[in-house]
């Protein structure tokens, strides 16, 4: 298999067929980092914010906060997964239709979503949720002391407690990052086994794991290449955001004040957020197209050659 030709073909598909961009946006839908940066600035810029957070943690409505926040996070995770599933399902079906010599249409996307989006959603939940829970477990030893200190209006945390929390966070990084890469590869193959072969949810996951075991060399070779491409795009976004933040902080022209008391041109942040989502859309469309081409050329061709 020529990986350069596969990636060039994926590039041509993304550049030529703009209908894919809509579903690439859905597949890669996530809050832009510019929004996270703005929220972080809001928390640190207002001198009253620590006191407000303390009141929320220990005030009369604290029970509602401790119960409602996890439920809200779970609901956000499910909504996010559902939106992503719609995009992934349509992208796989449309790229496959292109490779069969037919034009991609919204009708094809709709039929694929009606038939397979529910299964794709379950695949994502079954693979991502355990990883998310494990990540949370590793963060708890550091997060709990921080929340306790905020609730008790303390500015310091005992050194051994911090060291223990940092140890578990570092251990979690060493475990979660390789696991997330492996799960991503299983998910990509399982998605295509579901949409292109019509497999059930659990059968698709089992097939994705079996395909990695049987064809680990090609899967790893493509996966590392795509991981590098996504990493470069992510690094570009992070560097651009930091440059923008520095430019805003040094701007001599009186910047606008936000409702949180944070100074910063909202128009610039909004523009950057849109640009970030555009880059993420293109990258997600390219990655999905590459995996679909890989699945067709290697795994489906292997099956067709089997007696």
Model segments located where?
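Hydrophobic alpha-helical membrane segments
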Residues: 1-307
